[in-house]
Every structure is written in structure tokens, then in C-alpha cells.
Amino acid sequence: VYPLSLRETTDTAAWDARLPASPQATVFSSSAFLRATGCRLRLFEVLRGQQVVALLPLTEDDSGQRVLPPPYTPYLGPLCLHEPGLPNRERVLDEFLLGEMLAAELATRYREVRLPLSWQYTDVRPFLWHNYHAAGASRYASSPRYTAVLPLAGLDAETYPARVRACRRQERRKAAALRLHDDIDIDDFLRLYALTFERQDLAVDAGQLACVRRITEAAVGGGWGRLAGCSTPQGLASATLFVRDHARAYYLFGASDPAQRNSGAATRLIFDNVFDALNRGLLEVDFVGVNSPARGDFKLSFDPQLRLYFELHHVAY
């Protein structure tokens, strides 16, 4: 049995080509998305001998001594690449050995590590057991997080609304005459985005807006994102950016005009994005985080299923 090792790669084409084979891979693992965040990016392959068995995308701070999650990135790595048909007992063991190696390697290389895991990466034992028998040694901590995922198998436009909370159905009917469109000006979208946070007494600085712009432009220009809006006679009332990969669509950004919050536009736009994902043949819609009360409740009202994931944190002593 060959030991596991890390090898850095700059071949983004090969990297992206491998992503569909990993259950943990998402659009947030793609080189295009990670470049758009503007972070210092390093891409690693995990080798067993000469075979690539996993991928590990990392983003570092300017010092190169800390691994920090990029902005607007709920999940990252590791990304397992199992052989098709691998028995479950071998898959569990392979993932454990991978986690064990990465826990030790990252703790040695970096002063601090913050790593958000996919909700499909379920075995965090190797990280939690790092230095298990070493009294006083540094340990990994894990923070539970939740997202909400709507399976699209068997879903259709006729029956889905009945599954959604009654108030959302009412808002959809209220907004039935409003105009849905994809010809959104990014400046208009960013204006609404800033207003959405201002209404909650939250500031969005210029750096954050610049990052949202880069991601939005990359997604729309690269064909892996949809910037859509819903307008009233008074103008753009709500806008969303859904990004997508080979399997699912992700509700990444949402923005609404505070003066038109009661128009039902935001709700109608969510329905439209769900049906768009269905028409594209995608498997799921990920609502990307239900980790605050009001926003989480809005997303859960569309009948997705809760999914638990973890963010790992390690600080070297």
C-alpha cells in the first residue's frame, strides 16, 4: 500500500475536469470561482503512489501561514476521488486515512487553518482525533453549520408550489404579473445588494462589493451563473445570482429593494430559479446556508431538506 502525499498543481483544466467525479466537489471548488474571489489560491492533489485519490483547494492569507476560507464560499475541501464501485467499507477507510494525513499535514504547514467542508464530507473523526493522546497539544475544533437542499427528482412546476409554505404561495400569486428577466445591470444588482444590508444596519464595504462583482461577472460571463431579476412598474424589486455546477444550482446572492419588499418579487424569483434548475436537468438546488433565524426561515419555507456540515479550525501552539 502506497503512502499518501500532497502535490501542488497549477493545471486548472485537469483540476476542473476531475471535479464531477467527487461527491464533495461543488462550483465553489472550481478554479473559475476560486480565482474570482481574489484570494491567494493553492491547489493540491492527494496521491497514493502516482494515482490522484483526492483534491484539496486551499486559500491562504498574504503571509502564507494561514488557511482561511474565501469570501462567499460555504464549502471547500477535501474532495475525494473514489474508484467506481468501491465497497462502502473501503470507502470509509480510505476517507479516514485521507483525513488523518491531511489533519497532520495542515497542522504542520500552517499556523492556523479554517476549512469549511462539504455537507457530503461526513467523517470528521480524523481531524477531531488529531493529537488525541498528546496532552496539551493543539487540537482541531469543529463548528456545525447547516444548509438546505431541495432535491429535484420528481419535482414539477404543477405540484411543487403545494409543498411550499402558504405565505410563499400567496406572495407568488401576488407577484404573478411582475416581469422576470435576465438582462440585469450588475450596477443595479450591487445597488440593491448594498441596500439589502443597509436595511439590516449592516455595512458592506467596497472590498466586499468588489468581490461580489468579480464573482457575478465571472459566473455570468463564464456560463456557470444566472443573474435574474423581478421588476415592478417602479423598477427592479429583487435580484438573485444562482451559480451552478454539474449537479446543482446554488442560491449565492440575493438582493431586494427595501421599498418594494412587500411586492412578492423575491419569492417569485426563487420559484423561477428552482424551475430553471429543473429545466437544466440539475439534481438539486442548494439554498446555501440556513444559519441565521430570519434568512434561514425564508429559505426553509421552500421545502428543502436540512443538511449538516462542518467548519474545521486549528491553531498551532
How would you describe each model-predicted region?
Residues G64-A137, H246-P304:
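Acyl-donor binding region in acyl/amide transferases
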Residues R199, K299, R307-Y309:
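Secretory-pathway/luminal and periplasmic proteins that interact with or process carbohydrate-rich
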